[in-house]
Structure formats: C-alpha cells, structure tokens
Amino acid sequence: MPVIPPEKLVSLQKNQENIRNFTLLAHVDHGKTTLADSLLASNGIISSKLAGTVRFLDFREDEITRGITMKSSAISLFFKVISQNDEKRVEKDYLINLIDSPGHVDFSSEVSSASRLCDGAFVLVDAVEGVCSQTITVLRQAWIDRIKVILVINKMDRLITELKLSPIEAHYHLLRLVEQVNAVIGTFYTGELMQLADNDEVISDEGIYFAPEQGNVVFASAYDGWAFCLDQFSEFYEKKLGLKQKALTKCLWGDYYLDPKTKRVLQPKHLQGRRLKPMFVQFVLENLWAVYESAVSNRNLENIEKIIKALNIKVLPRDIKSKDPRNLLLAIFQQWLPLSTAILLTAIREIPSPINAQANRARKVLSSTPHYEMIDPDITLAMESCDASKEQPVLVYISKMVAFSERDLPNHRRKQLSAEEMKLIRSKLSESIESGINTISIEENVSSTNSDNLEGSTTDMDDDKDILIGFARIYSGTISVGQEVYVYGPKYDPVNPEKHITKVTVESLYLMMGQELVYLETVPAGNVFAIGGLAGTVLRTATLCSSPNGPNLVGVTQQMEPIVRVALEPVRPFEMNKLVTGLDMLNQADPCVQIAVEENGEHVIMCAGEIHLERCLKDLRERFAKIEIQASQPLVPYRETTIATPDLLAKNKELSIGFVTATLPVGGVTIGITVTPLSGSVVDFLLKHSKTIENVSSNFSKKNRNVVVSESLTKSMEEVLTPEKFYERLSKLLEEENSDLGELKNHLDSIIAFGPKRVGPNILFDKTKKMRDFRRQSDETKLIPSDLSEYVVTAFQLITHQGPLCAEPVQGICVSIDQFDISDDSEDSKLLTINNPQIPGQVISVVKESIRHGFLGWSPRLMLAMYSCDVQATSEVLGRVYGVVSKRRGRVIDEEMKEGTPFFIVKALIPVVESFGFAVEILKRTSGAAYPQLIFHGFEMLDENPFWVPTTEEELEDLGELADRENIAKRYMLNVRKRKGLLVEQKIVEKAEKQRTLKH
C-alpha cells in the first residue's frame, strides 16, 4: 500500500464522527509494539513482511536494546471502509490516532498519560501467560478513565507451536482466559459498588464484561500478522449453514454444537451422548490449526494448495517453496485474516467517536475537577458536544511533555518533494544541460524550490538541543497557531482564578507521526496532537483554555511512587549549570521522576525502579544535560522503629523502659519523657489516614501551623474522617493494646502533635496538661510550660524525621510528656524568662536527646523498603528463581501454577536495597525464561537489633565474643551512616602489631 500523505490525515481531522483515538495497553512483552507494526504496515509506513520485527514506534536506542517500550508514542493512520448500503457502494475515510504505551511496571505513569488522551483501548493478553500483574494495572487505569476496552488475546500461535494443544483443549483454555479477565473487571465493579453503598446511585454492569459474541474480543497473532473477530467467521459461514449472521455469531462462542444432519444448533443438554465438537472448535480453531499443521509442524505442500484454493487467495510460488515457514504463514494470513483490518474495523465499530465519547464521559470528568459548579457552563456544553467551531471556547488537556531534538522539528527538516515536483526539477535540469547553462545555478533553483520555509534551517545545528513539546488532546473549539490561551497549573482552582494561571501564545502545532512531527496551522476538537511553546510554562501536565474560568483537568493520580534515589554531580564541576538545566528538562519530560536538592546541596533524582533510573541517567547524559555525570550508589529509604522484646520485658519488670528525665543546662526546668512503641494496627491506621491527620493537626494550637505534606498525599484517594470519627477509631485501637498504651485512650485530648512533618505515624502526648495552659500569673515575662510547647513539638518533629539509628524517618513510637516542671527556687530562675534566647535551643536539644535515649531503651529495629516481585517461570527454571530470591534476602510468599499452562507464578518480597541487578541475574540464571516485575510494596521490619552482641553462654560459645555471624541490620545502618557522614564506630587499623608482607 502506498504511503498516506500527511495532508490526507490533516484533512480528516475536521470530521469528528470518523476519528478514533485509542491506545494499546498490556503487560510487558505481550505484543503491543508488534501489533502496532502491523497497523503501520497497512498505511505503507513499513513493509508488511517486516511487521513484528521492526518495532517502528520503539525508536529510542535503549528501547531497541532492551526490546521493551519505555515511552508512549503516537502516530496517525488512515483507514478506508467500503460497505454496501441498498446496493450502493459507500466509502468512509477514518482517521486513527494510535498511542503505543509501555508495559513495564517502572513506566506505569506513561500508561496513565496515554489512557487519559484516548476514548478506547485495546488490552493485549498473552494467550499462554494469561493475566499478569501489569495486565490488572492497565485494566484498572482504563476503568478509572472510563474508556471503552477491547480485549485482544494475542500470541495464539503459541498454543499451537509451543503448548501443542489440540483445538478442543485450546477452546477450553481460551474460555478460562476470558473468565480470568472478566473476574478482574468484576473486582473493579464490586469495589465501586461498595464505595457507593451509601449513595442512591446505581451502576449498571451492562457492557463492562468481555464476550467474543458481542464483538469486544479479538483473537490474534501479531507476530504472524493475523487477527479475527467472530463476526468474520459468521459472515463466511452464514450462507453455507443457512443461519442468520447475528444468531451464528452468538453460537460461535461457548457450549454450542451443530447437528450435522439437521443443521440445528444444540446445547449440551440436547447432545444425548453424541460427541460433537463446539462450533468455535469446528468452524474456527480447526481451520487455524490446519494452516499451522500444513505450513509449520508437518509441512505438506498438497494440503497448502487445497487451503489456498478453499480460501480463494493468491500466494506466490516463492512463498510456498520458502524454507522459512513464516513467509508462507504471512502470505496466507495477510489475505485471509489480516490483522490490521480486524483491529481497525473493531476499533471503528466498538470505540466511540470523540463526539459520542465526550457526551458520555465529559460530565463525569468535569465533576471530579475542583469546584465543578463554578465552571463556565458554555465550556461544559462545548466539551460534551465536542464542538469544533471557532466561536466555542478552546479546552485542551496536556498529558505530558515530550522531548524532541530541534533538528527533528518540521522547520529544520527538508520538505519531501512530490512526484510532480521531482518531475519538474528533472525537466529543468535536462533543459539546462541541453542549453549549456551552468548546472550550479539550477541546483540553486532546486534548493530554493525545495521548501517554502527553509529560512532558519541554515542555522548552525552542531549545537543540537532538545525542545519540549506538549502531548495533548483538544476537547472543544479549534486551537490555532498564534492564539492566546490560559495555562492552568495542577493547583489551579476556580475559587482563586488569579493563582496558578498564565497566559501564553501558541507557537506551533504538530501532528505526531512517531518520531516525526508534521506542522499544523489549526487543530479542531476531538484530536490528539502536539503543541509547542510551553516549555517554560508547563511542568508535566496542564490545562489550556481560552477562558479564565475553565475546569482544571489535571486530576491524574500517580500509581507508581518513585522509591529509588540517586545523588548526581557533574564530572567537571564548572558544568553544574548544565546539570541543573538538564534536570529541569527531565523533570518536565518524565511524569514519574522527582527532582530534589538536599540540605547539603546535592541534586537527587527519584525514580520508580532500576530500569527507570537507567533511562533517566541516559537521557540526562545524551539529551538534556549533554555532559558527563557521576551518579552515586542508589539511596534507598529506610524507616526506624523500636519494639518490646520478651527478654527485654522480663529483665526490666520493675523498671519503666523508655522513661527519661532531663534538666535544661540553665537549670530550673525538668522534663520527664516516656517513649513507647506503637502496635502495627495503630501505625497502619495512622499511615492510612494521613489526610485526616493533616486536617486535625491544623487545630492543635491557637496558631494555624503550616502543615507540610507531600503532593502525593494530597492527591491520594484515601477516606477522610472527621476529627471525632478519627479519635473514636484511634481510641478503639489503643484500647486493644495490652501494654501501657491502653491507658492513653483516655488522654486523646492530650495529643499535641503527629510526626514527622506533622502527618506521620508517631504521636506526641502531653499527660501533664500544661502545654496548652496559657494562663499567666502576675509576672508576664516568667516562663510557663505553654511557652515551650512549640519547641517541644519542634524537637519531636526533628527526631522523628531523622531517627537515632541512621537519621532516617521514625515510624511507630508514642512520646508522652509525663513531667514538665519549672522551679521558682533555682538559683538561675532569673534566666527563665521568655526573652532568654538560649531557652529555645536548649529545650529542643534536651527533648531530642531524651527521646533518643527513650527510643534506644527498647529494642531498635530498621524497616526495609520492600518490592513485591512477580515472576512467571516454567518448572525447569523454578529452582533457579528460588535461588536468586534467597540470595537477595527475599522470601517467597506464594506460588501457584497457571491452569492449562506450564507456567508457575512466584510471588516474593525482596528488599529494595538488595534488588539492584536482580532482574539481570534472574534473566542470566534462567536463560531468559523468567522476567521479574518489581512493584513497591511498603516497609517491613527487619527483625534484628543492629546493636546486638553475644551475651549468654550459648551465644558466646556458638559465635564468640566478636559475633562471627554478620549482623545484617548493623551493616545496613553503618552503610547509611557512612553515606551521610555520621559517626561510625569502626577501627581503621586493626591488629597493627602484626607484620604484613606484600609481594610486588
């Protein structure tokens, strides 16, 4: 097929009824990019024989090397549908906006960016591997965004060539697979019903499940270039069987059988013991199996000739005689069941046009935006109707910023000449040769006619730089180059329309064609496009609107929080400015990465995982900063906690563990503090209700303190409780405690702070009731406890933010102020005034040290950041997977065999600190047969005291005085302390009196 000119695609943008915007979603390596290749081949962009091997939309070097997609990429395609209507031939041209998205868990943010721009999605599932962890993630994203989903059961050829299943076995395998996917959808539906249990709103489950007879399931082999829906076979057999197509389509899936004598469709109860095959097996699968049997398994040229004749297709003799069976398969299937036709026809039939999609989704999307009732009603109506008239307000959603090389922009690229232009140039050239005119002048004329906009292209491109382009969808109106629009930041709120809003001029508009861009003058509503000129204004996502009172569409929740941190510095210090500029561009171009500057001046990037980190470093070195960068070892987060061990409680029955009394250096002020561990249930409750704690914290004092909370917390979908409900649940949890914490349920009104950052899982109690007593006696300058409450809270926040073990955040302690006395009899009582500048520092220092001693009085523990690891492996390599997990100090928590497949699913927990290189090692040990997916699971306590030394006779006998067994917790703690420059008790020289002879 000839290449479709961009002008043809641009002309189709104005007809919203014939536009389809969809994305490809799947688990890693389930065939998204291979399927996209076949769709591109239908437009002549790549050869149909190379489809599946080119991976055209994976144009990054690291994507090609690893064989996985890392960045979402978009391309526009043309598709013509010819139909018969009342004996008239009707032709319709469609514009297909396709977005290919990554499947690896590290790039989940790219999936949400792609999904938000589309009206539908094809979710690919490997026919052998089935539903995997990332399959559930992408299905959940599609459910949240309310887009139409079509299931593609890909790699059907593996059932024949690898599993060697018979058609009847494959039938039951596919039935179970569709049920598995529907079970996932069912969990989303029931979960939403539970959330709306208190409301009168009723959600229908009509149309949410996948059923091949309804046309929302496609069976495919993207690598072999074929795909089909049931209606294709029902149309073929309609006349032969004498059944109506709709009725036949319903019978081609499930337990339906055809009586060969009466030509009637039977159900299982009417079989009467006869062994008939299901119609799906008889009319669909056996035909596919016959092709593979004759072309691949047992090559039989005679059978191949019969198949070609029966299908009424033409296959070249060279393809029939080819030694590579794939050439023959492609030649047969691309004429019989072409993949692009099945996918695109399904997209046109099942996925709604932008007009229909926005009519159904617009109200729900807008109702989730801040202060929806204040939005201009004209914008709401224009969005619902997808009105593209120039009089309507422009509303655009910027999903993410994409980096393009400046030389790849249309104004720096030579325009490709049409056949007519090339013919004209050749004729002029031949005339010049005949007339003897110097050809140099002709070449100059040719270059001048080569492009209308070559001005500026002669600029020096040696210093090539990257330009950030917005990846966008327009919902209403028509946006034009040179038009002025308002940019709403993520924090924009119609209540304060003057904040987080900027006015910009649209510099350029583009049609995205993979790694190429096509210049546009205007873009009407319903289209996916790229927009330039926003690099200094938009950070990651934004909303563009021609009105200052529009909706803020940036309500995307980030599913994958960055957990791996790395400190960066330039190899040449004088290039620090380039590093800072590069980090700013990376921060805009990557939706998941986070950039921070530490107190010591270090620049730190936070990534979702090891592969994500490698991609970010590569982008910095080669695209954004273009300098040599030195990266530290990954900085893994820890948490510090303390517990009550049985032996500790037995030794100190009469002593109060964790109680510390301290006096200020100026004298006269005595503070008694008790530190007690919180139970896991209380800690989980506090972590779950961070937003509620934020609201409660603002009422703790007469001053409304600034509450620091991370952006991810403010965007979370957690349940926000009222203060009364929060205290009621907390009281109930404390009442269940068997320790001294049980009595604290009666002192909930004495809570004066949570920490760290005023929202953490640690509690500060004031049992003395003095910290909030602001009544004074006659002397107004004399200290009272309430004057020092702010400094006590500050000390609590500091020590919980940087704990005693290795200055990592503390989790799960309760600090109670049991004593707070200010003596009048002290010799230094004159110094105890509110005007003494020494008091604040001394209070903070003393309280911090007291909490530290109380914390260490119990049995301290480190909490490790953990990855949840899913590995799919065969029985042959299962033992090696266990070996690698054990070597990395992980533990297997579940193992199950996938029914009907040779695969085992192994679920394990692995410390993040031990995970670097884990994926590579698994691949090496299993020869590529197993690939892990790592998702951040949370923090888990390492049950080992970092200060433990042998003390009992048995321990001394087994381990010796120096403890021959390595203390893992101590090693982790010392490594963090070394990195942070904290004191480490380690001998630099050990046994110096011994001679050591070195051989040179």
Curated annotation (Swiss-Prot):
PROSITE patterns according to UniProt: G_TR_2 (PS51722)
Binding site for GTP: 26-33, 100-104, 154-157
Regulation: GTPase activity is stimulated in the presence of 60S subunits.
Catalysed conversion reaction: GTP + H2O = GDP + phosphate + H(+)
EC number: 3.6.5.-
Location, primary (coarse class): cytoplasm
Keyword annotations of the record: Cytoplasm, GTP-binding, Hydrolase, Nucleotide-binding, Ribosome biogenesis
Domain tr-type G: 17-246
Pfam families documented for this protein: EFG_C, EFG_III, EFL1, GTP_EFTU
GO cellular component, one term: cytosol
Protein purpose: GTPase involved in the biogenesis of the 60S ribosomal subunit and translational activation of ribosomes. Together with sdo1, may trigger the GTP-dependent release of tif6 from 60S pre-ribosomes in the cytoplasm, thereby activating ribosomes for translation competence by allowing 80S ribosome assembly and facilitating tif6 recycling to the nucleus, where it is required for 60S rRNA processing and nuclear export. Inhibits GTPase activity of ribosome-bound EF-2.
Protein name from the UniProt record: Ribosome assembly protein 1
